[in-house]
Design a protein with these regions (language model features):
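Conserved helix-turn-beta segment of the N-terminal RecA-like "Helicase ATP-binding" lobe
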Residues: 21-25, 32-57
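Short glycine-/polar-rich loops that comprise or flank the Walker A/P-loop
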Residues: 22-23, 49, 93-94, 117-120, ...
Length: 187
């Protein structure tokens, strides 16, 4: 799903949980800061879903789990390497995997996460890639350049999720005073 930043990723998960389309959701992000941001949003908007931050917590009783790709790979691999092979999450543990910022760093290295879990896969991005070695569309089995759905800026503004953009003029020093060669550093 192509959607602008701030257009309601938390709301999407909320709707799917309320509609009983899924019981347990794995929300993946590529940075710890995004994991923390998502956990805070889920706690604020979905407190009954008992969001679990898999980067810092070991709980397994939530409905929404949030993790980075490396943390989830570690959880999958650690279980496979453990004595007895008991994994923390079985292949059917999650009904839905939501991939935040799906255009970044998920192509070859972390594709094993999607192969391991038997779950529906939803990718969220504002800027899908359509390159030979990094194609967001092919990762989700889509025709290049054709997302499943797109939620544009105008739609998000009309629904009240986003404020309309506002241009602000910010005069910079070099625009006011110009640039003189002798003032430039060697770098």
């Amino acid at each position: 799903i192509v959607g602008k930043t701030g257009a309601g990723k938390t709301a999407l998960v909320d709707l799917l949980l309320r509609a009983h389309w899924c019981k347990r959701v794995l929300f993946l992000a590529d940075r710890v800061a995004l994991v923390n941001q998502a956990v805070n949003a889920f706690k604020a908007h979905l407190p009954d879903a008992a969001p679990v931050n898999l980067v810092t917590e070991k709980a397994t009783d939530g409905r929404v789990y949030v993790s980075t790709y490396p943390s989830m790979m570690g959880l999958i691999n650690d279980g496979a390497n453990a004595e007895g092979g008991a994994r923390r999450f079985g292949i059917g543990h999650f009904d839905l995997i939501v991939v935040d910022e799906a255009h970044r760093s998920i192509y070859q290295k972390y594709r094993a996460i999607f192969s391991y879990f038997d779950a529906l896969l939803v990718g969220l991005t504002a800027t899908p890639k359509d390159e030979i070695d990094r194609n967001t569309y092919s990762l989700f089995g889509l025709e290049s350049g054709v997302p499943t759905d797109a939620y544009g800026l105008d739609d998000a503004i009309a629904a009240g999720y986003l404020a309309p953009p506002r241009a602000v003029s910010v005069p910079l020093k070099f625009q006011r005073e110009g640039i003189r060669y002798q003032d430039l550093s060697d770098d």
